[in-house]
């Protein structure tokens, strides 16, 4: 079976390394490549994928929303998130999914077992935030709180959440067990500070969905304060495992995938 990840740029993607490690571990001769598709060529997506004879593919920035009009069916989770990161090609039909939310939550559950009783604050109200919030809302008992700079961003949400400003989030920071940053602040090349951690409780788990850099500025600051931190590496691995399950109906080897990514990040 042939798979790929599409994006622009795409040379930095660790998806091929991760998926190939999984294939090797499971004794599969499947292939996985990275395809750079510029925005101006995206209208040729059906032709490009058809020529590659793919059975499924992942989508990353900047095409997660752009792919939707080309799909025959979109899964509920992807509709809720407003973005697609996984496509299954079956009987000539393109089916879109979003595994980012479930990927993040599965990873978070492994480090925070009592997740269903946690008071959670999500920073940012974009597609990543929405996907994670919808997944958490399925079983977390306390109402989720989502903070954003502008309240207008919540107009596309139909989830029962507490909607607050970032200024209010700073004030009430001590009330949360878990704080999750879903904004680009702290990504490689972006040193913007999203929130002041002055009122962060020492017992709060500080999380970021980014894994490059391995510790974003907000995670470094929380760690200096003595808090436990959790980055986006597991989200990346688990979303990949969920994609593999959608394509093949098989369980992925999580350990081999994570090891391959860690080795790559360490430059081994």
Curated annotation (Swiss-Prot):
<feature type="binding site">
    <location>
        <begin position="13"/>
        <end position="15"/>
    </location>
    <ligand>
        <name>shikimate</name>
    </ligand>
</feature>
<feature type="binding site">
    <location>
        <position position="85"/>
    </location>
    <ligand>
        <name>shikimate</name>
    </ligand>
</feature>
<dbReference type="GO" id="GO:0009073">
    <property type="term" value="P:aromatic amino acid family biosynthetic process"/>
</dbReference>
<dbReference type="InterPro" id="IPR041121">
    <property type="entry name" value="SDH_C"/>
</dbReference>
<comment type="subunit">
    <text>Homodimer.</text>
</comment>
<dbReference type="InterPro" id="IPR036291">
    <property type="entry name" value="NAD(P)-bd_dom_sf"/>
</dbReference>
<feature type="binding site">
    <location>
        <position position="100"/>
    </location>
    <ligand>
        <name>shikimate</name>
    </ligand>
</feature>
<comment type="function">
    <text>Involved in the biosynthesis of the chorismate, which leads to the biosynthesis of aromatic amino acids. Catalyzes the reversible NADPH linked reduction of 3-dehydroshikimate (DHSA) to yield shikimate (SA).</text>
</comment>
<feature type="binding site">
    <location>
        <position position="209"/>
    </location>
    <ligand>
        <name>NADP(+)</name>
    </ligand>
</feature>
<dbReference type="Pfam" id="PF08501">
    <property type="entry name" value="Shikimate_dh_N"/>
</dbReference>
<comment type="pathway">
    <text>Metabolic intermediate biosynthesis; chorismate biosynthesis; chorismate from D-erythrose 4-phosphate and phosphoenolpyruvate: step 4/7.</text>
</comment>
<keyword id="KW-0521">NADP</keyword>
<feature type="binding site">
    <location>
        <position position="232"/>
    </location>
    <ligand>
        <name>NADP(+)</name>
    </ligand>
</feature>
<dbReference type="GO" id="GO:0050661">
    <property type="term" value="F:NADP binding"/>
</dbReference>
<dbReference type="InterPro" id="IPR011342">
    <property type="entry name" value="Shikimate_DH"/>
</dbReference>
<feature type="binding site">
    <location>
        <position position="211"/>
    </location>
    <ligand>
        <name>shikimate</name>
    </ligand>
</feature>
<dbReference type="InterPro" id="IPR006151">
    <property type="entry name" value="Shikm_DH/Glu-tRNA_Rdtase"/>
</dbReference>
<feature type="active site" description="Proton acceptor">
    <location>
        <position position="64"/>
    </location>
</feature>
<dbReference type="Pfam" id="PF01488">
    <property type="entry name" value="Shikimate_DH"/>
</dbReference>
<keyword id="KW-0560">Oxidoreductase</keyword>
<keyword id="KW-0028">Amino-acid biosynthesis</keyword>
<comment type="similarity">
    <text>Belongs to the shikimate dehydrogenase family.</text>
</comment>
<feature type="binding site">
    <location>
        <position position="76"/>
    </location>
    <ligand>
        <name>NADP(+)</name>
    </ligand>
</feature>
<feature type="binding site">
    <location>
        <position position="60"/>
    </location>
    <ligand>
        <name>shikimate</name>
    </ligand>
</feature>
<dbReference type="Pfam" id="PF18317">
    <property type="entry name" value="SDH_C"/>
</dbReference>
<dbReference type="GO" id="GO:0019632">
    <property type="term" value="P:shikimate metabolic process"/>
</dbReference>
<dbReference type="GO" id="GO:0008652">
    <property type="term" value="P:amino acid biosynthetic process"/>
</dbReference>
<keyword id="KW-0057">Aromatic amino acid biosynthesis</keyword>
<feature type="binding site">
    <location>
        <begin position="148"/>
        <end position="153"/>
    </location>
    <ligand>
        <name>NADP(+)</name>
    </ligand>
</feature>
<dbReference type="InterPro" id="IPR013708">
    <property type="entry name" value="Shikimate_DH-bd_N"/>
</dbReference>
<dbReference type="GO" id="GO:0009423">
    <property type="term" value="P:chorismate biosynthetic process"/>
</dbReference>
<dbReference type="GO" id="GO:0005829">
    <property type="term" value="C:cytosol"/>
</dbReference>
<protein>
    <recommendedName>
        <fullName>Shikimate dehydrogenase (NADP(+))</fullName>
        <ecNumber>1.1.1.25</ecNumber>
    </recommendedName>
</protein>
<dbReference type="GO" id="GO:0004764">
    <property type="term" value="F:shikimate 3-dehydrogenase (NADP+) activity"/>
</dbReference>
<dbReference type="InterPro" id="IPR022893">
    <property type="entry name" value="Shikimate_DH_fam"/>
</dbReference>
<dbReference type="InterPro" id="IPR046346">
    <property type="entry name" value="Aminoacid_DH-like_N_sf"/>
</dbReference>
<feature type="binding site">
    <location>
        <begin position="124"/>
        <end position="128"/>
    </location>
    <ligand>
        <name>NADP(+)</name>
    </ligand>
</feature>
């Amino acid at each position: 079976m042939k798979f790929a990840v599409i994006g622009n740029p795409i040379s930095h993607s660790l998806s091929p390394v991760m998926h190939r490690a999984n294939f090797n571990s499971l004794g599969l001769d499947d292939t996985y490549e990275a395809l750079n598709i510029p925005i101006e060529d995206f209208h040729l997506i059906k032709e490009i994928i058809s020529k590659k004879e793919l059975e499924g593919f992942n989508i990353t920035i900047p095409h997660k929303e752009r792919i939707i009009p080309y799909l025959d069916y979109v899964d509920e989770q992807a509709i809720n998130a407003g973005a697609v990161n996984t496509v299954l090609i079956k009987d000539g039909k393109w089916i879109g999914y979003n595994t980012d939310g479930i990927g993040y939550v599965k990873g978070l559950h492994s480090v925070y077992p009592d997740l269903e009783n946690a008071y959670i604050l999500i920073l940012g109200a974009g597609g990543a935030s929405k996907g994670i919030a919808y997944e958490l809302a399925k079983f977390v008992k306390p109402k989720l709180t989502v903070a954003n700079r502008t309240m207008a961003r919540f107009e596309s949400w139909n989830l029962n959440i507490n909607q607050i400003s970032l200024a209010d989030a700073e004030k009430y920071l001590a009330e949360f067990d878990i704080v999750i940053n879903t904004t680009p602040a702290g990504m490689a090349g972006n040193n913007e500070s999203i929130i002041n951690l002055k009122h962060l409780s020492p017992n709060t788990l500080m999380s970021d969905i980014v894994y490059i850099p391995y510790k974003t500025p907000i995670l470094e600051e929380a760690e200096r304060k003595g808090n436990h931190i959790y980055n986006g590496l597991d989200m990346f691995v688990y979303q990949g495992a969920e994609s593999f399950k959608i394509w093949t109906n098989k369980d992925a080897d999580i350990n081999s995938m994570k090891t391959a990514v860690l080795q790559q990040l360490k430059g081994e």
